Amino acid sequence: MCIYKFRYVDGLDQGKGMYLLFIKPEIITPAGLTARPVLTSYYKSGNFRNRPFNRFNIYTSPDETILCSDSKQSMYCQLLCGLVQRDEVLRVGAVFASAFLRAIKFLEENWREMCSNIRTSHVSDWITDPSCRNAVSLILGKPNSDLADLIEYECGSKSWEGIIKKLWPRTKYIEVIVTGSMAQYIPTLEFYSGGIPLVSTMYASSECYFGINFKPLSKPSDVSYTLLPNMAYFEFLPVEKNHEEMSEEIQCNGVSDQNCIQEEDKREGMQTVDLVDVKLGHYYELVVTTSTGIFFFFLQI
């Protein structure tokens, strides 16, 4: 993924990415199976833990902070590491825009304590995860009063407009998903970004990748995704009404209302079309069949 972005943004191999990544709690199903989100599965797998070195994909967050099961400790440690390595950060982000904004809000509430950590080279006592403490302590290194003063000056300003650019001045873009339901967060991201481009690189779910944005520097309103037909078998269910109206109909599914039932019956009776028969300018609901034979209705495109 990072290789194709290198075509549009120079020098990504000359620094690090401050990507805020988290694991989620696992649950045990009635059958005794472990269920967890796909990203949690990936971060806990050997593919992530033992990934080969890639100069385009170096994180400021140690793996120990990403794999911390306590979300507050994980967030704190990842942001602290990102601040300490601010001069090396070339890109920042999270999976979703909402998650990245939660991190900014968390920083607003905790920057003073982080400055104290940097000034004294001591991790806060409430960080009790031993792996996190050890990993962050190594990154903190020696006391750094100059860095703590700089962060205090920027974060203590009356307005946080452009704070991302101020704290991480070499940042070339913010990588978060800002399409679909995440589009509502674009104005807030632009307020904090200081003019840094918002990059939405992919379209995916737990089942598979759907598409990639091959023009990553396009405006959020102009983002489009190129479908990856090798990831799953895609079919397209034509939607007669506009996107907003259809979304409302889907939300009322399962409610014992006759109009909803009629709309659902009508939807199930429609025929899907293959990719080659999709018409430009029309709306479709994506129907995905995975390699395991599981299929599901996803959402509109």
Where are these regions (language model features)?
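Conserved structural elements of the adenylate-forming
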Residues: 1-8
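Active-site glycine/GP-rich loop and adjacent strand/helix microenvironment
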Residues: 11-300
